[in-house]
Amino acid sequence: MRVLQIQAPRKCEIVDRPVPQVQDNEVLVEVKACVTCPHWDITLWTGVDIFERPGYPRYPIPAGFPGHEVSGVVVKIGRAVRNFRTGDRVATLVDGGTESPGFYAEYVSRPEDTVAKLPDFVSYESGASLEMANCLAPFVRRLGNLAGKRVGVTGVGPAGLLAVQMLGAVGAAEVVAMDVLPERLELARKSGATETVNTGTPEGLQALQAKPLQACVDCSGRGAALQTALDHTQGLVAVFGVIHGEAKLSTRHWLQGLSIVTCLPRTPEDTTFMLDMLAAGKLNAEALVSARLPFERYAEGVQLLIDKQAIKVCFYPK
């Protein structure tokens, strides 16, 4: 089968690999759509480690990685599989790990408890982002009862735009989207944000100062944006983005009653929470897909992400 592999910084090839063998508890999925996780794709493509570990990344990257957000059709099931049948439309819920083969491939084999069925009304392009929504779910749930509250999202890239949808779905009275790119703020409004704030302007910061947030999800991955969240939230800040740069705490933050959570593990309850939203039609990730390209144009797609000309890119194996 055809698999995309990053061989070195800014160099990739389509390599041939055997179709995965299906274990008893696994399903074999023919991949129909695979969307980028921009931070991970950009860092591996440019020779930077997303977690800032010494000696990483190590090339060549395992074939198919960092692809981990995919959807497709079940074409084979293991002997112990009970919840799926061939022909089911599914998406992955969990990545395969950084040292394992990734999902930029024609076929992937996954344990049945790490995939979910897609409702008929959900496209492959939208369903491929289920893994990202599953990652967001524990952060949104950790914020607690948001009914009637003013809640923020810093950084409205793909995760931030989904967070806007999720916060609105759980009943936040005001969902404030914050970014420095006007075009991203416009997308956030279309995704359900009740207010948008350009945090790169004095006027934007003044607006937050005048009306602080009661909770916030940081999806930026930037120290400066996290600082904005910390400075203007009187409650819990859930840090979803992998942070690069620094943010500082002071006595003022202590007096605000600020709480911070990071890197939350997912539970079955988180997944159920997210899938219920999907089934109710409250999550739509298709609007996040800015370009659709074959594997052969991977370099072009990642450059769109680097240049901020795309939110997510959907790649097709054939």
Question: Over which residues does each language-model region extend?
Answer:
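Mid-domain Rossmann-like dinucleotide-binding core that forms the NAD(H)/NADP(H) cofactor-binding site
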Residues: S123-T201
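Glycine-rich phosphate-binding loop and adjacent beta-alpha segment
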Residues: G223-K282, P317-K318
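N-terminal Rossmann-like NAD(P) cofactor-binding module of classical short-chain dehydrogenase/reductase
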Residues: A91, V217, A238
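NAD(P)H dinucleotide-binding glycine-rich loop of Rossmann-like/cofactor-binding domains
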Residues: Y56-A63, H68, N83, T92-T154
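Glycine-rich beta-strand-centered segment in the early N-terminal region that forms part
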Residues: P20-V35, D49-G96
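Short amphipathic alpha-helix with an adjacent loop that forms part of the alpha/beta core around
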Residues: T201-K211
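Short Gly/aromatic-enriched secondary-structure transition segments
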Residues: I42-I50
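C-terminal hydrophobic helical "lid"/dimerization subdomain
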Residues: V3, P268-K318
